[in-house]
Structures are given as C-alpha cells and as structure tokens.
Curated annotation (Swiss-Prot):
MF GO annotations: glutamate-1-semialdehyde 2,1-aminomutase activity; pyridoxal phosphate binding; transaminase activity
Catalytic activity: (S)-4-amino-5-oxopentanoate = 5-aminolevulinate
Keywords on record: Cytoplasm, Isomerase, Porphyrin biosynthesis, Pyridoxal phosphate
Subunit structure: Homodimer.
Cofactor (UniProt): pyridoxal 5'-phosphate
Gene source species: Thermobifida fusca (strain YX)
Protein name per UniProt: Glutamate-1-semialdehyde 2,1-aminomutase
Similarity section: Belongs to the class-III pyridoxal-phosphate-dependent aminotransferase family. HemL subfamily.
Length: 430
C-alpha cells in the first residue's frame, strides 16, 4: 500500500497560503476524492511524488509533454537558453523560428506569441471584433477556451468538473455578447445567424473538443461552420490549444483540413513552459498593433526559455513519435474497453486522433448534455484504483488521456495490468 504522508503534509501547508491548496482547481482532486500527490520529479513516462511513489503519467502536464518528461533535447535547449538570459524584453531570433515553425505546419500566415491559451483566445476574439466591427461571439456549450470572462459560459474543463454554469464574478455585461449553442448542432448555428448574423463577429470552437471529454465534431461540422461564417461575413476561430501539434504534426487541421480565419495554439508548442499563440490570415493579423489599431501586448510573450523548449519539442516530434503515440493510445483504449466489458460496466470510449476519453455511459456523447449525463462516481472509483496501482489519470471525468513518445512497453504494460482491478472498482458503484 502506497504511503502519501508527505503529500498530505504539503497539501495542508498549501491550503494555508494558496486557495484550495492548488493553482488550478482540477488539481485539488475534488471530483475524484482524496489528497493530490505532490510531485517532485518527472522522467520519461513517469512521475515521482514527495513520498517516493512513482506513477505512469497519462496526463503529460495536460498535453504539452509529447516527448515525455525531461526529454534530453528539451532539457539541453532550456539549459543553453537560461545560461544566455531568461528574458530580454526585446525581439529574438528564437521567436521568429518558432513562428516560422507554426506557419509551416498550419494554414496561418502570421502568428503572435503569447503566454497562455486564455491569452490566445482572448486576443483572437478581440482581433475578430476589431476586424469585423461586430460584437457578438458564438461559442459552444462544453467547449473550453480559457478563463476569460466572456467565454466561461457553459464551458468545459474545470468549469464542467465543478458543475458551474459559468463563474461568480462574470458579470452579465461581460457575457452579454456571447451566444452559447449546443455543440454539433448546425441547425442551431444557422438559426443564430438568421437572428443576429450581422452582429456576429466570430464563431469560436475547439477544433476537436477535449475539455468535456473527447467529443469529436460530426463529419462536416467544422466545414459547415466555415461555410456559414463566410456567408455572413463573420470569422471562424478554431481553438487548437489542446489538439495543436499533438494529434498530428499539424494538429487537428492535419487530420481534417478545414482552414479557419484564425487559430489558437498552446501546450505542445511550449514544451512544458508557458507559451501559446494565435494566428491567421495576414490581412487580419496585420490589424494588430503596432501595424494596426487592435491592441495586444505581453511582457514575457516570446520569452527565450519558452521558445527554446517549444522549438526543441516541435523539432523532435517526428512522424515516428506520432505513430508511436497513436499506437499507445490504441492499445490502452482497447484494453480499457476489454476490462470494463468483462465487469459489465457501461462505457463508451471516444477518440479524437490519439486523444481519448472513457465515458461511463452506454450512449454516444455528441454534446455537453451527453457528457454531463455520464456516471462520474464510477469514474472516481476507477481513477482511485488506478492511482493506487501507480497510474496517474486525469482527476476529472471530463478530460482526455495523454500519451508521449516516452511511453514504452514497460509503462504501457503497467497501465494495462492495473485495469482489471480498476474495472472491478467501477463495477461496484451504482
């Protein structure tokens, strides 16, 4: 039986100085119960906590670590960059190279580097409003675009985990121009544009939602969004903060090929450091300050540490890396289904490229209502049983599982061997 005494001690200390003891709500384990392990190191596919317990990590820092923890190329790039200076407050060649890397892989013509996915989506929407002269934004229930006020309405990720409709502190005025529609419902989109098409600046959607669990777009959904927005003079923003450079070298765009007006990126492009970007057509991006009048800025945007880690990650994420991750995800998802089926546990595993979510329901999940209808208590029991056996899953039912190039056969064997006991634990929950 693993011990967690040090983590308990650290969690108690943290709660005296940090709200809830964590700096991002889902880390507090409120959705699954228990005390979160406090991590001290990561190497390859493994995490080690303060009590010396090791875990196969299927979170990968919520997506960024596509090469695994402490990949030598990333560590070397960071050490070299840090030795030269951590921040200059001035342009660098590395940020040009990272922008070139993003442009070469996606349909965007220019990008602006920022520090978080929230900044990226917030800035993209400001640009869309400035470019169109319109105010309203269409988003979809269960899609998560960061914690900017106007986009927290019916959001996924932590907002879904804690069953919040939005958040206290988000005023009616700040969300008044946000139109929330059910996901995967083109008829609802057409109706919104029929009613207020000349007021809608943009539609923003996760290219493949993975923050209410993985709920892929129905065939042709993103393409239809592209057609509707173009017809009405609105812009389409596809959010690839999570899927970008993870599900393929070109993200979800590489799998589907729908080119929006603007895109947002994050996670993998920072290699585990705070970094994100938004980009799009040159005529739109040139409306940003200092070329245009739409203001956007950031003290640490494009900082040398994040750009070094991002470049090292993208340059080492070879086609072989993606093939390996695809195979790892396929093996584990099949094993999960086999274990749950053996115990008679209703479930549905939904994929978005090499991302997947195990929904504890027997029906296809196509929208936020379907995701919320699952048996989250069963997920909590499954999670705790996996954690006790040294497998670190997302501590919430509304998230994706992540794999890396470092998840070798030994790590995957450990995951698979833990599944029967976890399935039994889930089966005991009504």
């Amino acid at each position: 039986m693993a011990t967690h005494l040090k983590s308990h001690e650290l969690f108690n200390r943290a709660r005296s100085v940090i709200p809830g003891g964590v700096n991002s709500p889902v880390r507090a384990f409120k959705a699954v119960g228990g005390t979160p392990p406090f991590m001290v190191s990561g190497k390859g596919p493994y995490l080690t906590d303060a009590d010396g317990n090791t875990y196969v990590d299927l979170i990968c820092s919520w997506g960024p670590l596509i090469l695994g923890h402490a990949h030598p190329a990333v560590v070397e790039a960071l050490a070299k960059a840090a030795a030269q200076g951590t921040s200059y407050g001035a342009p660098t060649e590395a940020e040009v190279e990272l922008a070139e890397e993003i442009v070469s892989r996606t349909p965007v013509e220019k990008v602006r580097l920022v520090n978080s996915g929230t900044e990226a989506t917030m800035s993209a929407i400001r640009l869309a409003r400035g470019a169109t002269g319109r105010a309203k934004v269409v988003k979809f229930a269960g899609n998560y675009h960061g914690h900017v006020d106007a986009l927290l309405a019916a959001a996924g990720s932590g907002v879904a985990t804690f069953a919040l409709p939005d958040s206290p502190g988000v005023t009616g005025a700040s969300a008044a121009d946000t139109i929330v529609l059910p996901y995967n419902d083109i008829a609802a989109v057409e109706a919104a544009f029929a009613e207020a098409g000349d007021e809608i600046a943009c539609v923003i959607a996760e290219a493949c939602p993975a923050n209410m669990g993985v709920v892929p777009p129905r065939d042709g959904f993103n393409a239809k969004l592209r057609e509707i927005t173009a017809r009405h003079g609105a812009l389409l923003i596809l959010d690839e903060v999570l899927t970008g450079f993870r599900v393929s070298p070109s993200g979800w765009y590489g799998l589907e090929g729908v080119a929006p007006d603007l895109m947002t990126f994050g996670k993998v492009m920072g290699g585990g450091l705070p970094a994100a970007a938004f980009g799009g057509r040159a005529d739109l991006m040139d409306q940003l300050s200092p070329e245009g009048s739409v203001y956007q800025a950031g003290t640490l945007s494009g900082n040398p540490l994040a750009t070094a880690a991002g470049l090292a990650t993208l340059r080492n994420a070879t086609p072989e890396v993606y093939a390996h991750i695809d195979a790892a995800a396929a093996r584990v998802s099949a094993a999960v289904s086999e274990a749950l089926t053996a115990e008679g546990v209703p479930h549905r595993i939904q994929h978005g490229g090499n991302l997947f979510t195990v929904f504890f329901t027997d029906t296809e999940v196509v929208d936020f209502d379907g995701a919320r209808a699952q048996n989250t208590a069963r997920y909590a029991a499954f999670f705790q049983a996996m954690l006790e056996q040294g497998v670190y899953l997302p501590p919430a039912a509304f998230e994706a599982w992540f794999f890396s190039a470092a998840h070798d056969d030994a790590a995957l064997d450990r995951v698979v061997s833990a599944l029967p006991a976890a399935a039994k634990a889930a089966a005991q929950v009504a």
